Amino acid sequence: MKSCLGLSQNGFTSNGVYHIIPDGCKPIQVLCDMSTDGGGWTVFQRRLDGSVDFQLDWKSYKNGFGDLSGEFWLGNDNLHCLTATHDVMLRIDLEDFDGKISYVEYSTFKVADGVDKYRIGLEGTMAQLVTP
């Protein structure tokens, strides 16, 4: 499969780590969220408890770091591969220490390659939720 969305559309329903092969890219392991808002989301950053240092150098962000079962950054090269060949929606979920949950969705999310310093492109805020 090319993406978590493709896995979801083909009957995979469990959250977890999967191997995908995005168009024109090498196979990568990703964490797929198959339960949030219909499922099929690729998680590219997760912060839980501060167990992983995110104050790292450019090369670490380029290649990715951490552990998909805990805190991690998937890697800028992988993000470019995931967003380069087709439209991708971005959803950002946040939860504070009191359990207050917020999210925002963008209809278009792109990450440029390393030559363009992984420039982020966002368009079209689709939905926002802030719970009291």
What are these regions, as identified by a protein language model?
Residues 1-132:
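Extracellular beta-rich globular recognition domains, centered on the fibrinogen C-terminal
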